[in-house]
Design a protein with these regions (language model features):
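Contiguous, well-folded functional domains in the mature portion of proteins
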Residues: 1-156
Length: 156
């Protein structure tokens, strides 16, 4: 098994209220069927990269989710809103597959009003897809967070 030589921190990808992924009103996330992670109830409409890495995937059509492979090989996915997979014109990716991103770089915007009109929750999740590559991942507890400033997870 590969262990990282030094700790890596993930920064808040949105400004808002950080909550446990267990509280998300979607079993795929709350029951950690995809992976463990964290969620933010946003105060704004801009999503930033929580880490340095390479964009692995941008979901076509809806652009509601972006996967990033961190420079240390760990994969994270940011998923904007609930029940957004079939919606178009609400999320707008600012990156494409293969792009190198830096922590704090704007990677997506979304229309919060349109999400409300579609009766979709704008809570946004970050999941760590291949946690077995890390010795430990520690997510912080519920709190208000500021994008690019507040540490939300430490990976060892």
């Amino acid at each position: 098994m590969f262990f990282f030589k030094k700790n890596k921190n993930l920064k808040a990808f949105l400004t808002g209220e950080l909550v446990s992924i267990d509280t998300v009103n979607d079993d795929v996330f709350s029951k950690k069927m995809m992976a463990d992670g964290i969620a933010i109830k946003p105060n704004d409409d801009k999503i930033y990269s929580p880490c340095n890495g390479t964009v692995e995937v941008v979901f076509e059509g809806s652009e509601h989710a972006i996967g990033i492979v961190m420079d240390n090989g760990l994969q994270v996915m940011i998923h904007c809103g609930l029940n957004t997979v079939n919606l178009t014109g609400i999320c707008s990716s600012k990156v494409k597959k293969g792009d190198k991103v830096k922590a704090g770089q704007l990677i997506m915007t979304f229309d919060r009003e349109k999400l409300k009109e579609e009766n979709c929750d704008d809570i946004t999740m970050l999941v760590v897809l291949d946690q077995g590559k890390a010795k430990s991942i520690t997510f912080v507890g519920d709190q208000n967070v500021v994008a690019n400033e507040t540490e939300i997870a430490q990976i060892a």
